[in-house]
Structure formats: C-alpha cells, structure tokens
A protein has these predicted regions:
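Acidic, His/Gly-enriched loop-helix segments that form or flank divalent-metal centers
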Residues: 4-133, 138-143
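Short acidic-glycine loop/turn motifs at beta-strand connectors
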Residues: 43, 149-152
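C-terminal regions of proteins
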Residues: 145-147
Length: 152
C-alpha cells in the first residue's frame, strides 16, 4: 500500500492512522480487498491480512474477542489494519496467526531489539512470536518478498 498512497515507510509507521485512511481510498482497498476472505483457518493456523477482530485499547494493547469468527463487516474492516505484532496476545491459544500488513522489521526491532525498522540493519525476514508469524517484508522498501511453506 505504500506505493499506492505516496507515504514513505517512516511516515507510514509514525502516522499509521493517516496511512490507513489514505490506503482505504485506493482502488486496491476499494476493489481487491473487499473481494478477499476475512480469514482462512486450518487445524493449527489462521491466515488473515492484519489481525483477527479484537478491541484496541488506549494503551495500544488489544483485548481478545472469543467470538471473532462471527465478527461483523465493520469489525473485520478494522482488524484488517491492526498491527498483528502488537496484537499478538489476542490469539487463540492453540492457533498461530499468519498475517501481513505490517512490516516485520517492526517486530524484530521492537520485540527482539534486533536492528531498526528502516535502517541498513532492518530485518524484513518473517517475524515469529508467540501466536504469530508475520510475513510482510515491506517489499516496496526492502525489495524482498517473504514466503512460507506450511505443512498442516
């Protein structure tokens, strides 16, 4: 979405609500994303764009909604833009959520203290944490694409 909105990666991470609003006004969001499934679930994994519906709290944490599978369109539209690495504590106990949307260098930098988000030492490889595998390599910036082989 960076290339569609004109935001640079640093400003998108600082002004993420403005970035999300700008992204929602692109043909990608209006046409392609609207045609996508909200999630795909296997025995061990849930695949989704941003995250599962959760309640964002003022302290930037998220509260789990046990009925997320029955969430309405608005809840899914909101969850699509969540940063899964910040919301990872709101995962089902026996599932790992595989998500994109937010650059993996954020998780490596914030939670592993490994490199910076966008510096020369930024790590755009998949981010693995409790209940989450994040795969967004921020391709427009990093020139990389992350791929996983899942055997489930």
């Amino acid at each position: 979405a960076l290339q569609l909105t004109g935001f640079d990666p640093v400003m998108a991470s600082i002004r993420h609500y403005d970035f999300a609003d700008a992204a929602k006004d692109t043909p990608f969001y209006k046409e392609i994303i609207q045609a996508m499934l909200d999630y795909f679930e296997t025995e061990h994994y849930v695949f989704t764009h941003g995250w599962i519906p959760s309640i964002p709290n003022r302290d930037k944490s998220y509260s789990y909604i046990s009925s997320w599978r029955e969430a309405d369109r608005e809840q899914w539209n909101q969850a699509r833009w969540f940063n899964g690495m910040d919301a990872a504590q709101t995962a089902d106990e026996n599932k790992t959520i595989v998500c994109g949307h937010w650059h993996t260098s954020y998780g490596h930098s914030k939670y592993e203290h490994k490199g910076t988000e966008f510096g020369e030492d930024a790590d755009f490889s998949p981010y693995y944490g409790p209940g989450i595998i994040a795969i967004d390599a921020c391709t427009a910036f990093s020139g990389k694409v992350n791929c996983l082989v899942m055997e489930d």
